[in-house]
């Protein structure tokens, strides 16, 4: 603007905004170039590591053909197990299992009174799923990994009457105990347990339109455009699905589906103003750069663990922050263990885990590695010594770390991972004395059997809807439904150089992925997970919000995500997360004390839809799964919420308005809307009432030019910030901003109002169709 030039730039929003967008694009390109240049200095090291990993993989014996690298191997292993189960069920019908019948009868006589419909302690012993799920303790009643140590067997022989089950009388007789012990040793197969017949028959393949919708949502988090749909349907080639998968996985927007996943799993929790419990830096930008640059997952996880860069502007150091936390490195170890090792270590924060094998010493030894110094349990996290001295029942927990005892950095997970810390790792470390770097290597090494398997299982689960191992972040006591398939996928991940896209491609190319979904619940029992079909999945909050904007042709309308745009506060007490262009860029809008004068009303309209569908901006704890239960708020906010009302409005200059003006006929307009919103054409019965609604007045839908008046421009209001939000006018200004946000943008004056409202009703009805929020 200040450089002499012959170009005349009007000082209006329309003149300045394209210039700003061009400047942002130029700066982003420069930033990418700088990052790639710096990253290239490490390329040789990672090439060598991946070559070493492939050599190690080739040296290991395998019961399956690792060179078989196509998706047919997935379908072969799935069908092989279905066929085996069908044979077993036929044999079971011909030869009943008397031991199972006796064991289930014992449970029904002695246990179901409390652990049946009443579910005392959250434990349901009416079926095998309940047996494996456990109760409120989180521990399965039968541990299929260590059957003889199963809590069920321990409780029936306990010498303490307060802990023995059943609690009445003298407990079970010796004969009943022996039956249960033998039954658990066999795997606790239920007498009436059969795999549902539906789970033994593969579902049909999706049609092309439904496949494209599923693949596009899974790969880039958006609905396919009309043009993409039409081109795909018109393509007669046999390999068009494989080519579509390749195109989608190569799309730069592929990163946008994984960023919110890892935000949840890694508990990214940036706070716009004044850090609160477990606030982190905005390491979303580190994740975005790593995923867009297609960094192998072992590389970016290593960079995450190293926690470098500026914690307040997007560096991986932001992961290391945990505000108001008395043991932040212990918290980070808990997150890393759940994310990449399938281990739950939360209990070990204060005491040895009662239902897992990890101890306080394990957790704080790893925390010491991460912190590069000795570590200990802070006083505020200790179980008081008096607790263990209480008379009566023996406590269920132990605290093996003494008060004020410190733990040196060490790796205690050889038994879980199959990998021991040793000097043999030193050649792969630039600084063998750096315990944090050593931890990153131990975590991501191919010899760590858990890392590749956990990552492969997470990829599988995101695309299929159920894991080969459940739950994905707690493998203790669990068994895989398809162990050979899990190992094969893990090996393919290592062989690919830890490229997650390689596993996604294999899964998406399989017939399993391309089948119609089942709405049968995901069984906890691995026996029941046959994968005859993928699970029916609802869009994530991010997919939903982004698809709403994609279908209506509009971008996210939000204020800058900051309460301190003038930057007067120190960087560690305020953030600016910019203007969100994708839903994952949203964040908690809490402003310390919910001060109404600091409201961001337009951002709030987006956030309230996301929250209704399970998103949480404040991630104080990691999580893999969001709430899936139906909530009346979900249809309510799509039907009545301000965001959908604004998006379905044919606003001035919007694609919806232009479609209405350009449509040659009501039928063509309805067809176009169906393709934009539902990725298919309507049936005659579906189209008829919508076409009828648009036919009335269609030829007169455009207003005469002299009747079209320019939209009045709102008065520019002063900006309310942290620096001035306590002045009396601040609340008044914010109330007006909220009113404008709820009102939304003006309708396009070129369209006749009554016809336009009917047209908007048609758009609204498609957005509110139940199939809109479901992935096919």
Regions found by a protein language model. Name each.
Residues 2-3, 47-133, 157-163, 167-169, ...:
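Short, structured secondary-structure elements
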Residues 681-687:
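Extended, well-ordered alpha-helical scaffold/bundle regions in very large, multi-domain proteins
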Residues 140-144, 430, 588-589, 625-627:
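Short Gly/Pro-enriched turn/cap motifs at secondary-structure boundaries
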Residues 144-145, 402-404:
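Glycine-centered loop/turn motifs
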Residues 412-428, 439-441, 737:
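Long, low-complexity, polar/charged, intrinsically disordered or flexibly structured peripheral segments
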Residues 2-64, 184-199:
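Pro/Ala/Gly-rich low-complexity, hydrophilic intrinsically disordered segments
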Residues 426-433, 437-455, 461-463:
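Structured secondary-structure scaffolds
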């Amino acid at each position: 603007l200040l450089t002499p030039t012959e170009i005349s730039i009007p000082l209006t929003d329309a003149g300045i905004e394209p210039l700003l967008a061009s400047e942002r694009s130029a700066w982003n390109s420069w930033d990418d170039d700088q990052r790639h240049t710096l990253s290239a200095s490490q390329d040789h090291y990672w090439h060598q590591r991946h070559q070493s990993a492939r050599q190690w993989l080739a040296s290991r014996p395998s019961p399956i053909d690792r060179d078989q690298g196509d998706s047919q191997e997935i379908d072969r292993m799935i069908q092989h197990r279905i066929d085996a189960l069908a044979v077993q069920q036929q044999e079971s019908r011909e030869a009943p299992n008397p031991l199972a019948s006796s064991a289930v009868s014992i449970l029904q006589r002695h246990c179901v009174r409390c652990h049946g419909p009443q579910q005392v302690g959250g434990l349901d012993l009416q079926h095998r799923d309940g047996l494996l799920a456990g109760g409120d303790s989180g521990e399965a009643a039968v541990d299929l990994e260590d059957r003889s140590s199963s809590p069920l067997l321990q409780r029936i022989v306990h010498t303490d009457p307060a802990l023995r089950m059943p609690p009445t009388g003298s407990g079970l007789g010796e004969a009943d105990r022996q039956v249960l012990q033998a039954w658990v040793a066999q795997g606790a197969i239920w007498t009436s347990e059969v795999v549902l017949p539906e789970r033994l028959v593969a579902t049909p393949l999706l049609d092309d339109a439904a496949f494209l919708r599923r693949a596009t949502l899974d790969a880039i988090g958006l609905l396919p455009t009309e043009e993409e749909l039409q081109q795909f349907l018109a393509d007669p080639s046999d390999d068009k699905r494989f080519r579509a998968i390749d195109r989608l996985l190569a799309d730069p927007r592929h990163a946008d589906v994984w960023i919110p996943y890892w935000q949840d799993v890694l508990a990214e929790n940036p706070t716009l103003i004044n850090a609160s419990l477990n606030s982190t830096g905005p390491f979303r930008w580190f994740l975005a750069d790593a995923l867009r640059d297609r960094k192998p997952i072992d590389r970016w996880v290593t960079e995450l663990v190293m926690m470098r860069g500026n914690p307040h502007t997007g560096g991986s150091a932001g992961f290391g922050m945990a505000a108001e936390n008395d043991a932040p490195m212990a918290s980070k170890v808990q997150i890393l263990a759940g994310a990449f090792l399938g281990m739950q270590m939360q209990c070990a924060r204060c005491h040895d885990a009662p239902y897992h094998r990890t101890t306080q010493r394990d957790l704080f030894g790893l925390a010491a590695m991460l912190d590069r110094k000795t570590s200990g349990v802070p006083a505020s996290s200790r179980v008081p010594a008096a607790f263990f001295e209480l008379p009566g029942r023996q406590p269920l927990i132990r605290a093996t770390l003494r008060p004020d005892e410190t733990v040196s950095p060490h790796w205690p997970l050889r038994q879980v991972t199959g990998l021991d810390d040793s000097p043999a790792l030193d050649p792969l470390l630039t600084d063998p004395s750096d315990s944090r770097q050593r931890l990153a290597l131990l975590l991501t090494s191919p010899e760590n059997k858990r890392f590749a398997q956990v990552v492969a299982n997470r990829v599988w689960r995101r695309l299929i809807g159920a894991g080969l191992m459940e739950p994905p972040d707690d493998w203790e006591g669990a068994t895989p439904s398809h162990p050979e398939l899990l190992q094969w996928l893990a090996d393919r991940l290592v062989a690919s150089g830890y490229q997650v896209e390689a596993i996604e491609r294999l899964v998406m190319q399989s017939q399993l992925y391309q089948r119609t979904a089942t709405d049968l619940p995901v069984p906890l029992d691995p026996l029941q997970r046959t994968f005859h079909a993928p699970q029916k999945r609802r869009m994530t909050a991010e997919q939903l919000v982004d698809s709403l904007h994609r279908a209506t042709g509009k971008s996210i309308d939000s204020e800058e995500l900051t309460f301190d745009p003038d930057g007067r506060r120190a960087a560690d007490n305020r953030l600016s997360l910019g203007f969100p262009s994708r839903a994952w860029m949203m964040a908690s809008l809490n402003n310390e004390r919910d001060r109404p004068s600091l409201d961001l009303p337009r951002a709030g309209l987006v956030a309230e839809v996301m929250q209704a569908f399970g998103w949480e901006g404040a991630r104080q704890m990691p999580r893999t799964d969001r709430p899936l239960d139906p909530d009346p708020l979900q249809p309510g906010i799509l039907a009545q919420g301000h965001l959908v009302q604004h998006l379905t409005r044919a606003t001035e200059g919007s694609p919806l308005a232009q479609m209405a003006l350009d449509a040659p006929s009501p039928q063509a307009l309805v067809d176009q809307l169906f393709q934009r919103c539902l990725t298919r054409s309507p049936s005659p019965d579906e189209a008829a009432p919508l076409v009828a609604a648009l036919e009335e007045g269609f030829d007169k839908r455009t207003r005469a030019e002299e009747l079209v008046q320019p939209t009045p421009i709102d008065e520019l209001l002063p900006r309310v910030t942290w620096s001035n939000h306590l002045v009396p006018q601040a609340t008044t200004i914010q109330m007006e901003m909220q009113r404008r946000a709820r009102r939304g943008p003006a309708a396009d004056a070129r369209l006749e109002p009554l016809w336009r409202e009917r047209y908007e009703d048609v758009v609204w009805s498609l957005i509110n169709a139940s199939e809109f929020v479901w992935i096919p």
